[in-house]
């Protein structure tokens, strides 16, 4: 998800992923106007059709140098963008809002049929308890490196499963982070 590419390069990547047998591709939304991302990702989805599922990472829960910042997307924008992605058949929208806006995330989730994913930047079990209590996500993505290690991840996976939610480990770090996620 980290790389930013032109639509033609993304289409080439998608074709290669299909040839290599991948079932899903995650793309990063990064434009100031998220509807520009909807347009680009819609073109890619139109190209691949049902041959490749596409999910989108909005990167709205990010923090840099240890300092949390408020996401650019508010609830209204997140709902509108979600509905636009719904219309083009995206599998899930990841990190569409600030990860500590529990009420806003819950409202977003109720406002769309699109699967909402997140939690990679939340840390420790008590934060996931709040996310689950508010029913913020369909897909919980704890990052083993960023949020407390193996034991914390196992606990969150069990909590998500108990609530009939999907848990999929997240990683955006080095090879050891990927290995730990498995």
Where are these predicted regions, by residue range?
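Intrinsic structural disorder
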Residues: 1, 17-18, 51, 85
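Active-site beta->alpha loop and helix N-cap motifs at the rims of alpha/beta catalytic domains
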Residues: 1-15, 65
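Flexible, glycine/proline-enriched loop segments at strand-loop-helix junctions
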Residues: 1-3, 25-31
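Short alpha-helical segments used as structural interaction elements across diverse proteins
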Residues: 7, 23-25, 42, 106
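Catalytic domains of carbohydrate-active enzymes, especially glycoside hydrolases
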Residues: 13-25
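Catalytic core of soluble alpha/beta enzymes
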Residues: 30-178
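A glycine-rich beta-turn/hairpin centered on an aromatic-Pro dipeptide
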Residues: 181-182
């Amino acid at each position: 998800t980290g790389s930013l590419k032109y639509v033609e390069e993304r289409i080439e990547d998608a074709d290669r992923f299909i040839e290599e047998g991948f079932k899903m591709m995650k793309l990063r939304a990064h434009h100031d106007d998220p509807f520009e991302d909807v347009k680009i990702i819609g073109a890619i989805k139109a190209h691949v059709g049902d041959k490749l599922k596409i999910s989108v990472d909005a990167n709205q829960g990010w923090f840099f140098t240890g300092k949390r910042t408020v996401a650019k997307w508010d609830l209204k924008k997140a709902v509108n963008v979600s509905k636009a992605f719904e219309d083009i058949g995206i599998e899930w929208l990841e990190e569409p809002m600030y990860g500590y806006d529990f009420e806003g995330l819950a409202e977003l989730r109720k406002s769309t049929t699109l699967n909402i994913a997140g939690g990679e930047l939340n840390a420790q079990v008590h934060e996931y308890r709040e996310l689950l209590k508010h029913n913020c996500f369909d897909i919980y993505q704890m990052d083993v490196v960023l949020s407390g290690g193996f034991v914390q991840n196992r606990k969150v996976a069990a909590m998500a499963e108990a609530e009939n939610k999907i848990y999929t480990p997240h990683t955006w770090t080095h090879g050891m982070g990927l290995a730990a996620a498995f």
